[in-house]
UniProtKB/Swiss-Prot annotation:
Homology family: Belongs to the class-II aminoacyl-tRNA synthetase family. ProS type 1 subfamily.
Gene: proS
GO MF annotations in UniProt: aminoacyl-tRNA deacylase activity; ATP binding; proline-tRNA ligase activity
Primary subcellular site in the record, as a coarse category: cytoplasm
Source species of the chain: Synechococcus sp. (strain CC9605)
Name of the molecule in the record: Proline--tRNA ligase
Amino acid sequence: MRVSRLLLVTLRDVPAEAEITSHQLLLRAGYIRRVGSGIYAYLPLMWRVLQKITAVVREEMNRAGAQETLLPQLHPAELWQKSGRWQGYTAGEGIMFHLEDRQGRELGLGPTHEEVITSLAGELLRSYRQLPVNLYQIQTKFRDEIRPRFGLMRGREFIMKDAYSFHASEADLRETYGAMDQAYRRIFERCGLDAVPVDADSGAIGGAASQEFMVTADAGEDLILISDDGQYAANLEKAVSIPSAASPLPDGPEESIPTPGLGSIESLCDTKCWDPSQVVKVLLFVATLDDETLQPLLVSLRGDQELNPTKVVNAVSRTLNKGVLDCRPITPDYTNRQQIDPIPFGSIGPDLSDDVLKGAKTWQPTFLRLADETASELGSFICGANQPDLHRFNTSWTAIEQKPTTLDLRNARAGDVCQHNLESRLTEKRGIEVGHIFQLGRKYSEAMESGFTNENGKTEPFWMGCYGIGVSRLAQAAVEQHHDDSGICWPTAIAPFEAIVVVANIQDDTQGQLGEALYAELQAADVDVLLDDRKERAGVKFKDADLIGIPWRIVVGRDASEGIVELVRRSSREVRKLPHAEAVSCLIKALHP
């Protein structure tokens, strides 16, 4: 390919819409162009990158025994209604684009394909003799993101590889799950990414176990916690730890203490010289359940800890055996709309009476009471007295009549002691999720009534796994991890071209002829090469070459008459002046050892 024929439009200025480096570089280097909010065109250079990533993914999936297929992007609503996910994915802040056809039938644009593939498996996989089966596809997905951002990191349309496996036993599922784990590690290594596998929450997909693969980068949206001994890593949503010990309160009787204007933990502790770990703070929420019930929550947490919203949602779902569509804080405005008496925000205790919910228009009449382990373990503590500007000092759980359900509801954080090794502590890193694997169990096969006949002639639901890789996100994550001040530094395996021959002055016959000869020789050696034959200044060509990030560059310049060229490695900026034949030999050896 010649640059003179390539659709390459580079930008010198940073586009205002781009917040993170990788997004800026992909726009500036002419890889992508924004069409709408969260919608991008993949231009020729980017399409080559995506094709190379796809080739690696396809090779490793095939090597692991998976079979490629292609599923429809339009999904009948009935399938999602049968699984129980239609309401959660389309109502409120649901992420599924949905529409009606001209007959009024509801359809959704697939953000994921569990329902479709499980329905098909129920029709096609009748006997245990056909199992296990692992099917994958690579195609465009759609998600109605509330706030698309960061380019391809969080878009409304994106390319994804998703695989679904079907098994006759849980043991067989675990075996395939392990094989997919190894395949993913090979994929990310081959793509030149430093990806960390971490324990993860299963989220809306569900299932018994899941693991994310995170590319570590300062611009990552996710916080991951990693033990300093390297034996544990988890997403913040899932991470567990041993918190620091609470400061004990002095012995003494319970007393009520006026606290006018001290409605926050910070102001309360600063004014009274209390330690936040001595306080039980109480947070109120309303959870919208999948049966449209609005369930008030009363959650107790030690004052020096942060609540983990994902753990709260999971706790509600497990406790009530219902899905949670939404969970939002109760505010004074919210209580006013319910037409109930004012709640003493800033002075709420864990024994707040259900009476405050009397007369609520749509809420359930009682709280679901939950407490984090850090709060429940306190022998004595400070808490709100359920009256404005009043707190109780040295109270205890024995004085609380309605005991909460105790669970892990807090955020683990850097510096916490690890549960697996008391000598190890957690550290924080930012990460970009590029892959996620799940053991789904029988969640979907039971809901979809999809199963097989076992060796005893009885019908039972499939054991299932699912395995996703964000192909387009992976491409941008690679840029986030591999760039410098001048532009992108693509890993060779996924670069749009392996090498670029830059002719400094194409109007110089000697330079032009040597450039053409090098280009032809590299093509003959099966090198994926680009020739910059434009009638541009040499400085422009060098800047563009740095910006687009081709791993190797051969510069044909003023020494062309002597047969000397420069061989430049983009990632290290190492420059070697060599006879052209030696430069070609060195390059081929580096690319195809």
